[in-house]
């Protein structure tokens, strides 16, 4: 199993958390996360195989790639 973590700083992006929230579609392998105080937004994804494509609509709305994009193997 693979876990992927993607994080954006929205302070210097083209959008806000309020604009993003209605576009966040539920998914069994995706957990959306945010911190309004620090204007950060992201997602934690779990995959049985290679991670799938991230919704391009979200990247386009934010206007940049994530500042942090990490992939981890699940050990247990």
Where are these regions (language model features)?
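Short S/T/G/P-rich N-terminal loop/turn motif that feeds into the first structured element of a domain
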Residues: 1-76
